[in-house]
């Protein structure tokens, strides 16, 4: 998570859906949790059960795992969230499906992706430091149509 639009999106989600009466024992799963230049966990600090996964070990990563393997965790979550990862993953559709599968009934699946107008980043051509651990060397801006 790196820019103000992403931060504001997560803050708005939290402000709109999470209030003082919300159960603080909710279980959160974040896909792509490595702290490259900011972390969602700080914005969702109300949760006492938070699991962050990413492709490599590093700050804010609890488990090293591909997002397409999250069903192997054998549990369901109240919030399943991924910010700015799908545009770097060839298998983003599988990851999204798995996110929906591991979400509890009446839960939240929250996704933020790079879209139209965002310049390529996180590849060998553009500087892969923005997508550490990604071996796909893949980039695609996504739109609403991609999810339909």
State each model region's role.
Residues 30, 82, 111:
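Redox-cofactor binding/interface segments in oxidoreductases and associated redox assembly factors
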